[in-house]
């Protein structure tokens, strides 16, 4: 009888122990942060955007990029801002410094260029290689395709084609990678990293990841030589050991563009992440136009940008 009673107590003990363990597991699961869904950190998949204003309420930027505290932005006017607060689709930035992107760049050293070709530049591009790819292959332009994304291959690949063609015409050897990195989610940059590593085996002068932004059309529109053109924004990853080298290269491009094609550059955005720029000191991400625009105006922007790149790298 005593043995039977002991066994009963033993079973009750183990039953209670299992119950406590089950409850503990459920509570721990509920309180453990869950992995973010791809869409939580996705950028530019649609037409949503963040509006950034300065401390006086002036509009300084609208972008589909993820905007986080401590991100920095050098505006078209070379005003350097730092983001101090983000609240949903609104952000606040304070002025950090007034920069001078053109410091040290003599106007005498810059070529006079015309549409799509720097005809007065003594080119030293022969034998120089460049690489182009697209992390977000599906990005498109609504005025051309009726939608902001067209998987697997959107209008953005044709923007890359226009840029590659212009650079080749200017004397560069260009590899335009069209590897598919879909879907447009948080892992797209991990997939495109393999493409970047592959392209870098040829040791190019620079490598460019070509995108389009999400913002109102007016935020990316300009006119150059009487031609409606999409503006270009350079994006730098600030979680990146090559950030200083990447930023210096970006400043060279912006300063040169400001001289030969005023209004082309929208600015330089330094966001959280690395955008695979840790792989190379001359790795840049270009936002060419916005989803609300068209392939035509984006292609104009890409060709003008190619002239600027030629002016910078053609004089090395």
Where are these regions (language model features)?
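Active-site-adjacent substrate-binding region
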Residues: 242-268
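Soluble non-cytosolic domains of exported or imported proteins
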Residues: 67, 150-158, 186-190, 240-248, ...
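Active-site-adjacent mobile loop/cap segments within catalytic or ligand-binding domains
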Residues: 267-316
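Solvent-exposed loop/turn segments at secondary-structure junctions
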Residues: 137-140, 180-184, 212-217, 239-242, ...
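Long terminal accessory regions outside catalytic cores
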Residues: 1-100
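Non-catalytic propeptide/linker segments at domain boundaries
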Residues: 63, 77-135, 140-143
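A short, glycine/acidic-enriched catalytic loop
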Residues: 216-242, 250
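Catalytic-core regions of hydrolytic enzymes
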Residues: 142-222
